[in-house]
Amino acid sequence: MATTVEGAREVAEAAEQARVASIVFCTLRFAPETAAWIAEHGATGGWFTAHAEWIGALWAPGAESEFGASPWRREKGGLWDVGPHALSVLIPVLGDVTALTAARGPAGTHHLVLNHASGASSTVTLTLAAPLAAAGVDIQLRGEHGIVGLPRWEGAVGAFGAAVDALIASVRTGEAHPCDVRFGLRLTELLADAEAQAGA
């Protein structure tokens, strides 16, 4: 939504003042497979810890991604590109982040350690600049019910359609969606905090 807290807050306040519905497109919140998983395990509770790895290899030799030419991704890296997606899974399951520690690793990698309102903790590893053979996405929860992993999802097209449907429903009902501009503002606050701690 924005890469500064001030910018995100301006958007959120404008939406509130105009009384308009909003959606922030965090893919995994709307892809049918992952949205159902988030809802199920958020309702289950009893989670002790979680780990999210979002490891991209956009600029590795042999990589063939249309996103590799993006100047914005080169400048802001995995923290801002894929960080919102990882957090958009962890927060609805484990609760809001109450404390965050961040550190940098090799090739623009960011490591986050999070405490959540539920009492659980989680760790997150984010990069777009890993070797090609190291790339992948994995999110696991561990708790009273065992170990569960995020299912695979079928791209962004279906998720985008679901996000549009959610926006229309929010307009019709007047009920705010949990992944709206206020959630986008919260994500921006967390990512800006992580960036400041780890160093640009």
Task: Please state what every model-predicted region is.
Residues 1-29:
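Beta-strand-loop-alpha-helix segment that lines the small-molecule cofactor/substrate pocket
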Residues 30, 157-160:
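Generic alpha-helical segment signature
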Residues 26-29, 104, 130, 183:
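Structured beta->alpha junctions
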Residues 75, 81-153, 164-174, 192:
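Contiguous beta-strand/loop segments that form the cofactor/metal-binding neighborhood of enzyme cores
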